[in-house]
């Protein structure tokens, strides 16, 4: 008798493949090709302002659509719609390449669609029995997707076809989720006033912000830190970042399995101490131990991305999952800006002492832990 793969494993794989496509899109288009292209034709300030406005518009739309989806059980339909629109707007950039302002408009519409898709994508975890494993596997596949994008695709793809190719890759990797993932049928009347007034939820988001701030700062500044503190060459920096990706792959699986076995309420708080330990280690680390530091960086990032969305699913009303996931998305966006602002401030007050500035960043997770404790007391 032919053995069959259990359905929950198929669903987990489909979920992870979507994460792969999402990270390929982010690594190749959002972070690399499009910014380099558009800033040759449009003032950087206009691009930055447009990008920021699109994120605010995306959050406002996510709140509205999230409420609509939660009240009418439309999460899967919105996930499918915005996944298809993401691919469409991304591919359209190739056709509009000769008219930069129209290309920018298509890019911004792609960003907004992508953010909506991610909100409803995270909401679909609601139906998983093995939420931790599915989330962690998605994180692991995301790291693999980034590696594939930067190592194998970045040098081979050229503009403008890169946008059509990545749009197609994203669509192909989204299809398994569109076909196999089920719509959570939970629905209820949603009060935005109650959610905005949910003290426990807002305190959790604030505690989470302390982690996402240090995580996004690490992603943005790790290469610069290694160059300034250890005088590493580019090849050595790439090697350490590569080991960080390996730590992310291993960490996604590890934290996902641990979350299912121990419960996310036990696993998530470990992140506050994990990140503080990382920055203490970074302060004292000698050059010979940087590979281990890189592994720990990826391992810590994997913990954050694997557990945060599961924590929301398990600790707050499931009827309002889409609205709450839109707040998770906003937290990640805010952290990208505020974390870098704080890093710059620490460099300023320490007179460009990178080691000490990193150590100061390590105090944020400890502050976050005390905020998190307030959620339990409440």
Swiss-Prot record:
<feature type="transmembrane region" description="Helical">
    <location>
        <begin position="12"/>
        <end position="34"/>
    </location>
</feature>
<dbReference type="InterPro" id="IPR011701">
    <property type="entry name" value="MFS"/>
</dbReference>
<feature type="transmembrane region" description="Helical">
    <location>
        <begin position="235"/>
        <end position="257"/>
    </location>
</feature>
<dbReference type="GO" id="GO:0022857">
    <property type="term" value="F:transmembrane transporter activity"/>
</dbReference>
<feature type="transmembrane region" description="Helical">
    <location>
        <begin position="290"/>
        <end position="312"/>
    </location>
</feature>
<feature type="transmembrane region" description="Helical">
    <location>
        <begin position="92"/>
        <end position="112"/>
    </location>
</feature>
<protein>
    <recommendedName>
        <fullName>Uncharacterized protein aq_1569</fullName>
    </recommendedName>
</protein>
<feature type="transmembrane region" description="Helical">
    <location>
        <begin position="356"/>
        <end position="373"/>
    </location>
</feature>
<keyword id="KW-0812">Transmembrane</keyword>
<feature type="transmembrane region" description="Helical">
    <location>
        <begin position="267"/>
        <end position="285"/>
    </location>
</feature>
<keyword id="KW-1133">Transmembrane helix</keyword>
<feature type="transmembrane region" description="Helical">
    <location>
        <begin position="161"/>
        <end position="180"/>
    </location>
</feature>
<dbReference type="InterPro" id="IPR020846">
    <property type="entry name" value="MFS_dom"/>
</dbReference>
<dbReference type="InterPro" id="IPR036259">
    <property type="entry name" value="MFS_trans_sf"/>
</dbReference>
<feature type="transmembrane region" description="Helical">
    <location>
        <begin position="327"/>
        <end position="349"/>
    </location>
</feature>
<dbReference type="Pfam" id="PF07690">
    <property type="entry name" value="MFS_1"/>
</dbReference>
<feature type="transmembrane region" description="Helical">
    <location>
        <begin position="44"/>
        <end position="66"/>
    </location>
</feature>
<keyword id="KW-0472">Membrane</keyword>
<dbReference type="GO" id="GO:0005886">
    <property type="term" value="C:plasma membrane"/>
</dbReference>
<feature type="transmembrane region" description="Helical">
    <location>
        <begin position="200"/>
        <end position="222"/>
    </location>
</feature>
<keyword id="KW-1003">Cell membrane</keyword>
<feature type="transmembrane region" description="Helical">
    <location>
        <begin position="132"/>
        <end position="154"/>
    </location>
</feature>
<dbReference type="InterPro" id="IPR050495">
    <property type="entry name" value="ATG22/LtaA_families"/>
</dbReference>
């Amino acid at each position: 008798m032919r053995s069959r793969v259990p359905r929950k494993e198929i669903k987990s794989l489909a979920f992870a493949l979507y994460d792969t496509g999402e990270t390929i899109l982010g690594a190749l288009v959002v972070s690399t090709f499009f910014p380099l292209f558009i800033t040759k034709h449009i003032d950087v300030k206009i691009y930055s302002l447009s990008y920021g406005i699109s994120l605010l518009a995306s959050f406002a739309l996510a709140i509205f659509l999230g409420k609509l989806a939660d009240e009418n059980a439309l999460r899967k339909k919105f996930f499918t719609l915005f996944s298809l629109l993401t691919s469409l707007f991304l591919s359209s950039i190739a056709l509009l390449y000769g008219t930069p302002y129209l290309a920018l408009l298509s890019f911004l519409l792609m960003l907004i669609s992508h953010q909506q898709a991610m909100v409803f994508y995270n909401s679909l975890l609601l139906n998983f029995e093995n939420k931790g494993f599915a989330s962690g596997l998605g994180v692991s596949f995301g790291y693999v997707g980034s590696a594939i994008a930067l190592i194998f695709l970045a040098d081979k793809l050229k503009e403008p076809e890169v946008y059509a190719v990545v749009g197609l890759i994203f669509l192909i990797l989204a299809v398994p989720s569109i076909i196999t993932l089920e719509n959570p049928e939970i629905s209820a009347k949603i009060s935005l006033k109650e959610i905005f007034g949910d003290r426990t939820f807002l305190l959790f988001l604030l505690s989470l912000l302390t982690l996402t701030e240090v995580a996004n700062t690490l992603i943005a500044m790790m290469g610069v830190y290694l160059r300034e503190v250890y005088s590493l060459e580019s090849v050595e920096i790439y090697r350490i970042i590569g080991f960080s990706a390996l730590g992310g792959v291993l960490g996604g699986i590890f934290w996902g399995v641990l979350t299912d076995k121990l419960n996310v309420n036990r696993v998530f708080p470990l992140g506050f101490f994990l990140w503080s330990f990382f920055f203490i280690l970074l302060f004292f680390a000698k050059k010979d131990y940087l590979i281990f530091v890189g592994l720990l960086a990826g391992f810590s990032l994997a913990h954050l991305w694997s557990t945060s969305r599961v924590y929301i699913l398990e600790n707050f009303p499931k009827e309002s999952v889409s609205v709450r996931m839109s707040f998770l998305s906003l937290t990640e966006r805010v952290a990208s800006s505020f974390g870098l602002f704080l890093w710059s401030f620490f460099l300023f007050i320490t007179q460009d002492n990178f080691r000490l500035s990193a150590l100061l960043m390590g105090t944020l997770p400890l502050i976050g832990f005390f905020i998190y404790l307030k959620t339990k007391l409440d």
